[in-house]
Every structure is written in C-alpha cells, then in structure tokens.
From Swiss-Prot:
Gene from which this protein is expressed: proA
PROSITE patterns: PROA
Source organism, top-level taxon: Bacteria
Listed Gene3D superfamilies: Aldehyde Dehydrogenase, Chain A, domain 1, Aldehyde Dehydrogenase, Chain A, domain 2
Keywords, sorted A to Z: Amino-acid biosynthesis, Cytoplasm, NADP, Oxidoreductase, Proline biosynthesis
Keyword Metal-binding carried by entry: no
Name under which the protein is recorded: Gamma-glutamyl phosphate reductase
E.C. no: 1.2.1.41
Gene Ontology CC annotation, any one: cytoplasm
Length: 426
C-alpha cells in the first residue's frame, strides 16, 4: 500500500468511526447489551472456525521465531474463547454509565447545576499479540457509548479480522452501525503513525504494549493518550507490621503470578523489623525459585541468618519491572525513606504498606504518588475486577483523566448540565 493509499484508507476509517460514534453515543442500553450478547453467542458458535484461523497466526509466529510466551499470548484456546464470551456477558450486565447525572446543586439564582456522564467519542486502541483484546476493547467501548478503531499486532491479523467480523454481526443485529468497531486491516506500521495524529477523527488513544511502543507513541502522538507504563510496584514492611500479615501479603504480591503489571518488584523493609521479617519471607522466595537482588544491609541480615545465593542489587534494579521470578530488596531507615524511595524509583502504579500503625498507614497513602495505594493488602488487587469496576482496558499511570484501572467510567467524561425556569443573569 502506497503512502497515498494508506492515508486515504485511514481517513475513510476515521470518517466512518466519527459518524458511527454519534449513533453509538445515543444508543439505548438495551441495544448495546443486545449487541454484546449477540457477539458472545457468535463467538461460541464459531469457536472452531476462530481456532482454525488463529492456528494460521500461531504457525506464522512460530515460523518467525517467536518464543513460547509470545505464542501463548497469541493462542485462542478453548478457555480463551470461553473467557471472551463470558467477558462480553459480564460487560452487558454492568450498569450503563452514559447519561447518568450527578452532583446536582441548587444555586441562589434558582438554576440547578449538575454533571452528565458522556462518551469520549472515538477511541483508538493499539495493542500487540493478544487477540482477546479485540473483544475486550470493543465491548468496553461499545458499552461506554464510544466508537473504536483497533490496531492489533501484525502477528494476530487473521484472528483480529475474524473477531471483528463477529463484532460487526452483533452490532448490525442490534440495529447499530458496524463501523462503530473497526479493525485496521493493514499490517503496515505507518497506519499507527497516521492513527495517532488523526485529531480530526480520534479523541483519545489507548496503547497496550511494551515500553518501546509506548515510548514511540509518546514522542509522535498528537491525539491525547491514556497510557499504561511500567508496573514497578512496592511493598513496604513497616516497623510496626504484623509479621504474619507481612509474610502472607508479600508472598502473594510477588509469587502468585510474575507477569502482571501489579506484581511487586521491589520489597522495602524497615531496619527495625528486618531481622524478624526477612528470613521467613526470603526462605519462601528461595523455595519458589525467586532470585533475590539485595542491598548491603539486606545481605548482612540474610547472611547472618544462613542465607546464600544472594545477588547484589545495582542502582538500575530499583527501576526495573522484572515480570519474572526476581525481586529487589532494600532495607530502609523507616517510613520517610520508604516513601522517598517509592516516589523516586517507582512507576506510580501500585504500592502497599504493611503496618498496624494507623498514622503510618494514612501518611503512606497520602504521600505516595501512585494510582493505587494500599494498607495491609497485596498489590495484586490493583485490577478493575477486584475494584468492582468489571472489565478494564488497562491500568493508567497518568494523573490526568483516568488513573488506575480504566473501566467503563474511564472511557467517559463529564459535561455540565443546567436546569432553569427562565432565569437570566443580572
């Protein structure tokens, strides 16, 4: 596809999305739910065909030398297909935020002022190898009254196109424009460059991908972004922590799963409790095969307790998202240093304190500058489902617009509504 043809194609997609966004914005909850449930039924009906199409993507990925983890993310198994269908049904069951009016106030002039929740408009979503994101993103955008343009990874092009056809079927069955959800059908990388600069058609970009993708988009995008960067999550064991809670929470925060962005990557421990807290916890980590990268004070504490096989932490380790069985551990003087370390080295994602001291806990959640801050709970709870939001499009580290898990409300905005009785301003 020439540059001229690509620009024409992307402009057509953008115009269609903008036109469809107006219809989706005024669609009834019943029609949106009907579309979601029809898509779910179509996915179950065509499961075998979806697996056959996906198998071609998987075969191509293997031939291109992609590793096992990549192939696993790409594969549409029976479980993955069932999960997609169930997810659509769950989103259909969620309350519709669109049109909700809140914060109504009577003014001395006689008018009433409130805020109404409305769609953002057209959302561009850029993602990599997971074809299930096609359905998750389409469903969240549809329920929140937005049109969406989806740009998945080239490795999943056949799977994404097949899923998009089922989405179009569901939209049409509910009397909604099929152009409300469009998958970019070219694998040309220049399509991403055009999508992120189409300010006339696209209201916001939501990228889901690795560091290099996000970095490129931050440099080149003209459309505003809701982005998800690293998940460098911390747990701080305070001097007044309950040791049983500390061991249980810190074990779960690191070892329940290694790949999610809400997994703990750095453990901070008060020097006043390090000798009691570190040995039982690190014994569990070593039994589970977790590599421990430690500061000098932590090394001294653990070696005195008979530990070996420790790795010296470098300055870089405090800034790394491992997504692997590796944990950085630092012994700190106390709460002041813990908060300072998190705000300097963290990614503003999710951080937790283990303490029985109310004042310490409240100070931690006030002063740590992260999207989610916790007291006596695992960072693994930083999730839209666990927060009662239902499905999520991602977890935003940003401070503007959506922050933390981005569910239906995160894909909307508020406009002011005023009710009067003929009042005029004097």
């Amino acid at each position: 596809m020439t540059e001229f043809d690509l620009n024409q194609y992307m402009d057509r997609v953008g115009r269609q999305a903008r036109a469809a966004s107006r219809a989706i914005a005024r669609a009834s909850t019943a029609d949106k739910n009907r579309a979601l449930l029809t898509i779910a039924a179509a996915i179950r009906r065509d499961a075998d065909q979806l697996k056959a199409v996906n198998a071609r993507d998987v075969e191509r990925a293997r031939a291109n030398g992609q590793d096992a983890a990549f192939v696993d993310r790409l594969t549409l198994s029976d479980k993955a297909i069932a999960t997609m269908a169930a997810g659509l049904e769950q989103i259909a069951a969620l309350p519709d935020p669109i049109g909700e009016i809140s914060n109504m106030k009577f003014r001395p002039t006689g008018i009433q002022v409130g805020q109404m929740r409305v769609p953002l408009g057209v959302i561009g979503i850029i993602y990599e190898s997971r074809p299930n994101v096609t359905i998750d993103a389409a469903a969240l955008c549809l329920k929140s009254g937005n049109a969406t343009i989806l740009r998945g990874g080239s490795e999943a092009i056949e799977s994404n196109t097949a899923l998009a056809a089922l989405v179009a079927e569901g939209l049409s069955a509910a009397g909604l424009p099929p152009e409300a959800v469009q998958v970019i059908e070219t694998t040309d990388r220049a399509a991403v460059g055009r999508l992120i600069t189409m300010t006339e058609f696209v209201d916001v970009i939501v990228p889901r991908g690795g560091k290099s993708l996000i970095a490129r988009l931050m440099e080149e995008a003209r459309v505003p972004m809701i982005k998800h960067l690293d998940g460098i999550c911390h747990v701080y064991i305070d001097a007044e922590a309950d040791l049983d809670k500390a061991v249980r929470v810190c074990d779960n925060a690191k070892t329940q799963r290694y790949a999610p962005c809400n997994t703990m990557e750095t453990l901070l421990v008060s020097q006043d409790i390090a000798a009691a807290a570190l040995p039982p916890l690190c014994r569990i980590y070593q039994q589970k095969g977790v590599e421990l990268r430690v500061c000098p004070a932590t090394r001294a504490t653990l070696e005195a307790a008979g530990f070996s096989g420790l790795v010296d932490a470098s300055e870089e380790d405090w800034r790394l998202e491992y997504l692997a069985p590796i944990l950085a551990i630092k012994t700190v003087v106390g709460l002041d240093q813990a908060i300072s370390h998190i705000n300097e080295y963290g990614s503003h994602h999710t951080d937790s304190i283990i303490t029985e001291n109310y004042s310490a806990g409240m100070r931690f959640i006030r002063e740590v500058d992260s999207a989610s801050v916790m007291i006596n709970a695992s960072t693994r709870f930083a999730d839209g489902f666990e927060y009662g939001l239902g499905a999520e499009i991602g977890i935003s580290n940003d401070k503007l617009h959506a922050r933390g898990p981005v569910g239906l409300e995160g894909l909307t905005s508020l406009k002011y509504v005023v009710f009067g009785h003929g009042e005029v301003r004097t």
